[in-house]
A protein has these predicted regions:
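C-terminal binding/interaction regions
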Residues: 320-342, 464-505
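N-terminal glycine-/serine-/threonine-rich phosphate-binding loop
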Residues: 1-57
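Active-site loops and adjacent core secondary-structure elements that bind or stabilize anionic groups
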Residues: 152-160, 164-335, 339-369, 391-398, ...
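Glycine-rich nucleotide/cofactor/substrate-binding loop typically near the N-terminus or early
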Residues: 39-109
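Active-site/ligand-binding-proximal alpha/beta "capping" segment
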Residues: 83-132, 136-138, 380, 384-389
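Glycine- and Gly-Pro-enriched alpha-helical subdomains that act as flexible
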Residues: 273-293, 417-463
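Cysteine/selenocysteine-centered motifs that mediate thiol-based redox chemistry or coordinate metal-sulfur cofactors
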Residues: 301-302, 308-317, 442-483
Length: 507
């Protein structure tokens, strides 16, 4: 233990008073002189504990509607004064500035105010000035001062007060200083991002919540998730989500968001291997599973409707890692919980991020999330035969899945059902061949089915192979210098083709 310091004077200035009482009572027990302002001062006085108003220390009242309370040399001098420097001690004595050994702050809730949809004027008033200054000053002088920058550090402080009787060593203070600069940098980043509003190409992120995962993509890799999963899901049971689980859950949530009617999807390694839209969850599940029961084994399941007990009985026949739904019947939960390792998630209503960020080389790539999804009005027929209403429905269904599948990708669909797909291939024609093979493997007829491609056809061989397999309608973005060759082939063979002008690469 090194450079032991005893807390004798404390400044407390917090926005949220929750959980403050035990700390104040412990400080009072130890005989610490407490200084405070405004609402915090009133809170402490209501506890029957003596407190010195900061105004008595500075001889200045709170001014400008509370904008200036603690910004004064008699406050910051007591925080920044170096206890081992005789000249600092002399000045503190000369100007009658008491040493402040502990500073407790809880900042104005800037991020919550922004998220609430408050007016610009209200948001500006929630930019903390005095609090952030106190945090930085106390953290800078952590050699002598204990800084508690948020409620997250209250348990640590209580432990120091009870177990060490208000004494702290340098290691204690340094750890709290690190937390303080984390709080202050996060706060300033949030303010910058509010003002920037994506106007300038500047990437600043600060995510305070993190969770160490069992491992990364493979057991020899370390994995960490930064964010608050509890804002998106309630985990009913199961082991902790792994790195790969999280990637699959992310893909599943993004895919299911495309569908309004009752839909069930099964994913494996970020790609859909079964998707169906039907009147009920049970029907959608059965049809989705039939699409590729082999790949579905050990997959991630998601639906946008409540899972009932009958559906749960059928779902439970499959080994799966994760199931996600907005709600479950109580009986359905009991059925699904029979296998203890199953991860059962209740998805909460939440707005998904509008950006995607990933590392590349020695930097970071950021882009807008691919939030565009074509509707019937976006389709441009380019062939003599126009698609039927059912074909249009199947084309749009296939396009939704195609958008969320690794490139190069081809998707076959019919009657609101994913029949098969070819994914992650280095050539488009190979993706098409893969999709044909998988459809045949599971006994699906492609006669009258529709096909979606995430990008244009560089040659007419794709539409030729598709027609020979039974495909009657095609959706693709177009843009190839050989588009006309594909169109000509479709015209000669009665295939309907529509173009969207929108590519959906996914890497």
């Amino acid at each position: 233990m090194s450079e032991l310091r005893k807390i004798e004077g404390a400044l407390i200035s917090v926005f949220d008073k929750d959980n403050l009482e035990p700390i104040v009572r412990e400080l009072n027990r130890l005989g610490v002189t407490i200084y405070s302002t405004g609402g915090t001062q009133a809170f402490i006085e209501e506890l029957g504990i003596s407190v010195v108003p900061v105004e008595d220390l500075t001889s200045y009242p709170s001014i400008l509607g509370g904008r200036v309370k603690t910004l004064h040399p008699k406050v910051f001098g007591g925080i920044l004064g170096r206890r081992e420097l005789q000249s600092d001690i002399a000045q503190l004595e000369q100007y009658e500035i008491p040493a402040l050994d502990l500073v407790i702050v809880d900042l104005y809730p800037f991020e919550k105010t922004v998220a609430s949809g408050a007016s610009h004027a209200d948001i500006i008033e929630k930019i903390d000035i005095g609090g952030i200054s106190l945090i930085r000053a106390a953290a800078k002088n952590h050699k002598d001062v204990v800084i508690v920058p948020s409620k997250e550090q209250y348990p640590t402080l209580l432990s120091l007060l009870k177990d060490k009787q208000g004494n702290t060593d340098l290691e204690d203070r340094k750890a709290l200083a690190k937390a303080a600069f984390n709080v202050s940098s996060h706060y300033d980043t949030a303010i910058f991002n509010y003002f920037n509003n994506d106007e300038e190409p500047v990437l600043k992120q600060s995510i305070q919540s993190s969770k160490v995962l069992r491992y990364g993509e493979n057991p020899h890799q370390k994995g960490i998730f930064y964010g608050k999963l509890e804002d998106m899901f309630e985990q009913v049971q199961g082991k902790e989500l792994s790195y790969n689980n999280l990637l699959d859950v992310d893909a599943a949530v993004s895919l299911i968001a495309e569908f309004k009617d009752t839909t069930f999807a099964i994913l494996k390694h970020n790609n859909a291997c079964g998707v169906a839209t039907r009147p009920t969850v049970l029907e959608a599940w059965k049809v989705a599973l039939a699409g590729d029961p082999v790949s579905a084994f050990g997959g991630v399941l998601i639906t946008n409707a409540k899972i009932d007990a009958v559906s749960a009985e059928e779902i439970s026949k499959l080994f799966f890692e994760v199931v996600i739904a907005p709600a479950y019947e109580p009986a359905a939960l009991e059925i699904l919980k029979a296998k203890k390792n199953r991860i059962i998630l209740i998805q909460k209503p939440v707005t998904l991020s509008k950006k995607t960020v990933r590392t590349a080389l020695n930097g970071v790539l950021e882009q807008d999330k691919d939030s565009v999804m074509e509707t019937a009005s976006d389709l441009t027929p380019v062939t003599d035969r126009k698609p039927t209403e059912q074909e249009i429905a199947d084309l749009l269904f296939a396009a939704k899945i195609c958008k969320h599948t690794k490139s190069n990708t081809i998707v076959f669909a019919k009657d609101n059902t994913l029949i098969s797909s070819g994914t992650g291939q280095t050539s488009r024609v190979d993706a098409l061949r893969q999709a044909v093979v998988k459809a045949n493997e599971f006994g699906f007829s492609l006669q009258g089915a529709s096909m979606a491609s995430d990008a244009f056809f560089p040659f007419p061989d794709c539409v030729e192979l598709a027609k020979n397999a039974g495909i009657t309608a095609v959706i693709q973005p177009g843009g190839s210098i050989k588009d006309q060759e594909s169109i000509d082939y479709c015209n000669k063979n009665g295939v309907a083709m529509v173009m969207t002008g929108i590519r959906h690469f996914k890497h």
